[in-house]
Amino acid sequence: GPFLMLGIFAIAIAAILFFIKLPDPDKDKAADDVEAAADLKQYKSSVFQYPHVWFGALAIAMYMGLEIGIPSMLPAYWKADPSLPGSATEYLPFYWGGMMVGRFVGSAILAKFKARTLLSCCLILGAACVGISFFLPGMYAVYAMLAAGLFHSVMWPLIFNLGLQELGPLTKNASGLINMGVLGGATLPLVMGTVVDNPSLGVGVAIMMMFVYYAYVFWFCNFGSKI
């Protein structure tokens, strides 16, 4: 089904990220980082000793649950209300389009706001869209769900930046570790698809799962990234 295809796609992306060889950073910049580290602080010997990197990887996994969760749930709205026009697949491009627009707009405002402030606002507004969709009738519910894409669009770089704070020469290794969080995109849609298709659970439980993802990323943004 569509959930299996989403999971396979996410696994493929994760495999590419795992095996791809990232280019080395500029040598002069690396030397400057090491010199600055000697002057300012003593970095730990391994990236694995920084808890906020692990928390960041899990935040990326949770974000993947949010990003792919909406396309996973949208067909259930048509199943619950056959009177809705068209089909879920006809409206999914609006979700991805909203994410694309959000990324263009977000790139212009990322430099003007603190990462924690912007990410917190996007999480709250995205959660509001998803929550409201559960109570709205007909296409209004669909539009509210699709609107969440605008706020999801800038979360990835913000989570990534918070997970790479104050790592100096260990930044490259940490980025690889955080990228492994994309594996969450391979598992969470499958779980959510199972929940949505279960008559005793359904969309309501899937939305509660998304609120767990929102809550964790919010915690990471304001607390976990500082550890």
Q: Where do the language-model regions lie?
A:
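C-terminal membrane-cytosol helix-exit motif in multi-pass small-molecule transporters
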Residues: 4-33, 217-225
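Juxtamembrane intracellular "pre-TM" segments in multi-pass secondary transporters
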Residues: 28-56
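Extracytoplasmic gate region of multi-pass secondary transporters
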Residues: 45-93
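Interfacial helix-cap and linker-helix signal at transmembrane-aqueous boundaries
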Residues: 78-79, 109-110, 192-201, 206
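Loop-to-transmembrane helix entry
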Residues: 81-98, 173-177, 205-208
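Helix-to-loop junctions at the C-terminal end of transmembrane segments
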Residues: 102-115, 196
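Structural signature of the two symmetry-related core transmembrane helices
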Residues: 117-132
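Intracellular juxtamembrane helix-capping segments at the cytosolic ends
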Residues: 153-168
